[in-house]
Amino acid sequence: MEGPYGNGFEKVEGKVALVGGGIGIAPLYMVGENIENCDAYLGFRERPILEEEFGKVTSNVYTTSGDTLITDILNVEKYDYILACGPTPMLKKLLEMTEGTKTRIQVSLENHMACGVGACLVCTCKTHSGNKKTCKDGPVFWGEDVIL
């Protein structure tokens, strides 16, 4: 077994929202442990879990499940930074929501990876500075650079 690959979220200061969907929620717990003054927004397909755990490491925890999307309850302009991990449609919506605001966003992509060393190109993603390998250059990218 090898890993983890690539890079993590860059350290930021200010008011931060951690936004996770599905399996993208788990990586945000450790991020919450290392950032002061952050809120967690967690979206679940079914019933919410981990609320109590996130409550120990964040200021506030907001959850949605079922037909309500986590992006439906998030006001991006309340935050200096958003750190997000989850399904591509959620990340794409967050990029749209932050466009034209002062809020900066980092997204952790959930692309499939095969070799883990950048040779196979399975995990390639598009950015404004050319194609990048999620396993080597990511999986975390600044929102203004990545194209979803």
Residue ranges of model-derived segments:
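Short microdomains enriched in Cys/His and/or Lys/Arg
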Residues: 137-148
